[in-house]
Amino acid sequence: MKIHLIRHNTTLEFNNETSLLDHLEKNNIHHEYQCRSGYCGSCRVKIKKGKVSYKEMPLAFIQPDEILLCCCHVESDIEIDL
């Protein structure tokens, strides 16, 4: 799958083997985080296109157009405001 980062103007390949947050860090793209488990909401970003899901609904409140990088499962190519 492809992850397009709007503000970085770059696209990364992604295979769901790690969290999206971990994958971004491995590619030297850093974003704020704290808990890494869906509790705090610090890693929240806007999703513009595509679909994600969660194994368990995160405790952090998110809007329908937001995802948590630490715990989302990418279902399709996505475009995020990052």
From Swiss-Prot:
GO molecular function terms listed in the Swiss-Prot or TrEMBL record: 2 iron, 2 sulfur cluster binding; metal ion binding
In terms of Pfam families, this protein maps to:
Fer2
- Give the protein's cofactors: [2Fe-2S] cluster
- Organism classification: Bacteria, Pseudomonadati, Pseudomonadota, Gammaproteobacteria, Pasteurellales
Q: Please tell me whether the keyword Iron-sulfur is annotated for this protein.
A: yes
Keywords of the record, alphabetical order, are: 2Fe-2S, Electron transport, Iron, Iron-sulfur, Metal-binding, Transport
Residue ranges crossing the lipid bilayer per the database entry: none
Domain 2Fe-2S ferredoxin-type per the UniProt entry, residue ranges: 1-82
Q: Give binding positions for [2Fe-2S] cluster.
A: 35, 40, 43, 72
Q: How is the cofactor bound?
A: Binds 1 [2Fe-2S] cluster.
Iron recorded as keyword: yes
Q: Which InterPro entries match?
A: 2Fe-2S_ferredoxin-like_sf (IPR036010), 2Fe-2S_ferredoxin-type (IPR001041), 2Fe2S_fd_BS (IPR006058), Beta-grasp_dom_sf (IPR012675)
- In its UniProt entry, what is this protein called? Uncharacterized ferredoxin-like protein HI_1309
